[in-house]
Amino acid sequence: MSVEASILVLVGGFIGGVMRFFLSGYVGRRIGETFPWGTFVVNVSGAFVIGTAAGLGARLGAIFSTTIFHEFIMVGLLGGYTTVSSFCLQSVNLMLDGEQRQALFNIVASALLCVLAVAAGYGGIMWIMEWPG
């Protein structure tokens, strides 16, 4: 990765992360915290935006297909905003490529394994921290 690409990802990721922080907090304060609505809104909106950007790139090319657009918007901004958007785009691309089984596996396995990984990490720390001495 070039220095220019790294800077684009860095700046985009910074902006995306700040956007996620503010939108998620705003939604949580407005709707309530009984469900993670802030994260939900960020994930769905990020998935919509990355799908829109990918569609524009596929139909219009030009600026939507440039390295700058890809690294700043797709990887940096949307990656900082929500990584679920990348996961969703990859799943849709598998479907569009006729790889429905791989898409389904990606969706189910990612969701299941990520939840299990969080539980394992959390449980592991709880267990280690309870260790005497």
Swiss-Prot record:
Regulation: Na(+) is not transported, but it plays an essential structural role and its presence is essential for fluoride channel function.
Claim: Membrane is one of the keywords in the record: yes
Cysteine disulfide links: none
GO cellular component: plasma membrane
Keyword Cell inner membrane: yes
Topology term for the membrane: Multi-pass membrane protein
Similarity-based family: Belongs to the fluoride channel Fluc/FEX (TC 1.A.43) family.
Main location: membrane
Name of the protein: Fluoride-specific ion channel FluC 3
Residues the entry annotates as binding Na(+): G79, T82
Listed Pfam families: CRCB
InterPro entries reported in the protein's UniProt record: FluC (IPR003691)
Transmembrane segment boundaries: 7-27, 37-57, 60-80, 107-127
Annotated catalysed reactions: fluoride(in) = fluoride(out)
Record's keyword terms, sorted: Cell inner membrane, Cell membrane, Ion channel, Ion transport, Membrane, Metal-binding, Sodium, Transmembrane, Transmembrane helix, Transport
Localization, UniProt: Cell inner membrane
GO molecular function terms listed in the Swiss-Prot or TrEMBL record: fluoride channel activity; metal ion binding
Gene Ontology BP annotations: cellular detoxification of fluoride
Function per UniProt: Fluoride-specific ion channel. Important for reducing fluoride concentration in the cell, thus reducing its toxicity.
Lineage of producing organism: Bacteria, Pseudomonadati, Pseudomonadota, Alphaproteobacteria, Hyphomicrobiales
